[in-house]
Amino acid sequence: MKKVLLFSSLFLLSTLMVFAYETIIIKFPDRENWVKAYYKKVGLEAILQYVPAGQGSNNWTKSVVVHSYNQSTYPISVFLTNSTAKLLKANPTAGYKTLRLTDNDAIVGRCTKNYGKIQAQCEIFRVTRGYEGIVTIHYMNKDKDDFMENYNQWYNIIKRAKLYNSYYRDERMLDKAEYFEL
């Protein structure tokens, strides 16, 4: 009887993992109204953008972008290096500082200057290993003074963004955090 119970339990747990979907929870500042400006899932990639209320996906001063790359097996350091190379190609004025680097998670701070038609911005960029691949989380701000003034708050928000597997599509968070399917 114990073997049947054990087998049934293992089967149930493995079945639940198949039907789970990866989500992310981001807790935005309490007194700021951030809204979803863009979400698209195509194949193995999903991208989500949040902006302050009244701004849009192409017209923003601050933005949080989450991009998931399901089944991506790159080492975090390689993914970060490739991302930085793309940024430098688009805007060679970029400077960055590695703030945290482990095998499964990295955070860098970086700023650019105006370059051609590209407006200057500063960002906190996190690359993390999820359950199903790699997830990047960007906080971007086009106002360097505001970025520096609120740096610690946003560093902690991005650092504390949490990935987890959800088993119910109508699951609700008990706090004010935002979440979406990756």
Regions from the language model: what does each represent?
Residues 32-72:
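Secretory pathway targeting signatures of secreted, lumenal, and periplasmic proteins
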Residues 21, 45-48, 116-125, 150:
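Short, surface-exposed coil-to-beta transition loops
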Residues 136-182:
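Surface-exposed amphipathic alpha-helical segments
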Residues 16-20:
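Sec/Tat signal peptide C-region and signal peptidase I cleavage site
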Residues 4-15:
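Sec-dependent N-terminal signal peptides
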Residues 62-105:
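Mid-chain, structured segments of secreted extracytoplasmic proteins
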